[in-house]
């Protein structure tokens, strides 16, 4: 019951924080419609690559791990986790490199918004972090430690909200309110937030590995 309450509270907090930074970006002077267009165009490409690299991963791994644990095969559950970690780590790394090195082409030819190039570069590392995190989430869910993934998601959203506002304000001050740089800064915040979630899941696993199994 406590785990369900934690997850419910986490989801509510995530939605509230998401609303806060969305309203901030929409109403921030110098960002406005132009900034949102740059931000959104880059984010759409990022979301597409993210879908390819990690869609359905947590649920699939959770199912496989729980099936192994149900028959007492703890080593099998851990083997599934390690294979998935290596596999999706490689897929995430490829996605990151595609977005990083292809940012110029994507911005000028696909989105036809040249200003989105920096946004794409800023987002590229997030694909790797999210791909790895999705494997950890599936593993922990399969072991019924749902609170861990809820905390990681909440931590990510807290960092995203705080860092988005902080970085955009700093960039606006330094660049005299450059819309392009502010949009890129907002997506740097997204990347740092995904890293915070990855770091939490990784450290939890390292510190509790023997206890977990």
Question: What is the role of each PLM region?
Answer:
Residues 101, 112-136, 162:
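Alpha-helical transmembrane segments of multi-pass membrane proteins
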Residues 130-152:
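Membrane-interface junctions at transmembrane-helix termini in multi-pass inner-membrane proteins
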Residues 1-20, 75, 79:
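N-terminal membrane topogenesis motif
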Residues 94-117, 173:
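Short membrane-interface helical motifs at transmembrane helix boundaries
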Residues 59-104:
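Membrane-water interface segments that mark the loop-to-transmembrane alpha-helix transition
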Residues 26-48, 115, 179-188:
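Interfacial/gating helices of multi-pass transporter permease domains
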Residues 42-64, 88, 125-128:
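Small-residue-rich midsections of specific transmembrane alpha-helices
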Residues 147, 158-199, 203:
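Membrane-interface helix-loop junctions in multi-pass transport and translocation proteins
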